[in-house]
């Protein structure tokens, strides 16, 4: 789990990025108990435990930097676990990466090409069981078009938000063995569908993560 805003960081206060990747068992024991909460946090929660600090995300969207760090983590993992199930990278975003270089032809625009190239490099990282899979889910408080697992970029070209196309290009094509199982999560995905939801609602958000982390996909 990595957070990114003005910086890329571990949202788990007890586990620094330098210790990633981490096991589920380590994550399970890394919570902060109610005795460790600040007075402000105590006023805002009814839970006696907390795993994720959500208040550290602010400002920019340093997606390029985040994916650069994730690539190194995935590479290190695959070297140590060549026979494991391929890594799955799930990215939650509310908009366009803004740590990209300026477009050489239009200085008012950002150039997403370095991010596309980086994602393609990540997708090529593989174990003996297959390649890394990248999924993207976009969230917004603006009412707009909901797009689930588009097969063609034509399905999102009418969306004015440039992040719609960027996230499409970043996403992996859903592996064929996953398609039939997708119906069990309420998704009807055609062959060639991208592992990507734009302007997700809450139900789709939950199903996206259950689908993407389902152990029966292995």
Enumerate the predicted regions with their spans.
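Acidic, low-complexity intrinsically disordered regions
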Residues: 1-218
């Amino acid at each position: 789990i990595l957070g990114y805003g003005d910086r890329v960081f571990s949202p788990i206060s007890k586990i620094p990025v330098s210790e990633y990747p981490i096991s589920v068992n380590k994550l399970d024991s890394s919570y902060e108990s109610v005795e460790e909460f600040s007075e402000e946090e105590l006023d805002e929660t009814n839970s006696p435990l907390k795993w994720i600090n959500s208040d550290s995300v602010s400002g920019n969207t340093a997606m390029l930097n985040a994916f650069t760090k994730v690539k190194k983590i995935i590479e290190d993992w695959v070297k140590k676990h060549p026979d494991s199930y391929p890594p799955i990278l799930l990215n939650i975003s509310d908009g366009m990466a803004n740590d990209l270089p300026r477009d050489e032809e239009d200085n008012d625009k950002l150039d997403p090409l370095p991010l596309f190239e980086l994602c393609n490099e990540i997708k090529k990282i593989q174990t003996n069981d297959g390649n890394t899979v990248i999924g993207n889910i976009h969230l917004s408080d603006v009412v707009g078009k909901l797009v689930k697992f588009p097969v063609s970029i034509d399905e999102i070209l009418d969306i004015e938000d440039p992040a719609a196309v960027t996230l499409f290009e970043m996403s992996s094509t859903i592996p064929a063995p996953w398609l039939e199982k997708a119906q069990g999560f309420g998704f009807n995905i055609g062959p060639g569908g991208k592992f990507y939801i734009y302007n997700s609602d809450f139900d789709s958000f939950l199903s996206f993560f259950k689908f993407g982390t389902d152990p029966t996909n292995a």
